[in-house]
Amino acid sequence: MPRLYIKANDLEELDSVRIFDDRGKEVYYTKDDFIATGHRIKIYMAETITECAYVQEKYDRLGDTRFEFASKDRFGTVARDPMSRMARYLVDYDEAWEIVGDPYIWKYSVYRGAIKIIDVRSEPYLIPGQALNLTPTHIITFDSESDVLIGLTFVLAIYALNKYRY
């Protein structure tokens, strides 16, 4: 099962974040921009420096915020459920994804029906080749290799929805 690692301090403090694999190799990096229509997080392949995915802030007619996430030919949106007092999310994607857990503290899972496809945890971890001590790290585990990039954009969309709420 593929895993990606994001240093929690970098994500909170910097507008550019490196994303590592199990061996400590940088596989993606992100760049957060603010443009006239809202926030946009671009995801680049680390080796080729080409944009491979993005997360874009969008507004509807009622003024509610949602984030569009896209990777190659796969895309969807995620928004906070305005009818719920709890942290519930409305996911519009071609597969029925459901979030179980608490995204505010990076401890949740994403299910497609009854199958867990993404697991997100935040805990002290030593990324190989990146640190000499344990650092707060967001660990994203995917069920299959084909869901890695779209899953990463989805996780960053949830993060952006929680961070940039007004």
Residue ranges of each PLM-predicted region?
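Intrinsically disordered, low-complexity proline/glycine-rich segments
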Residues: 1-166
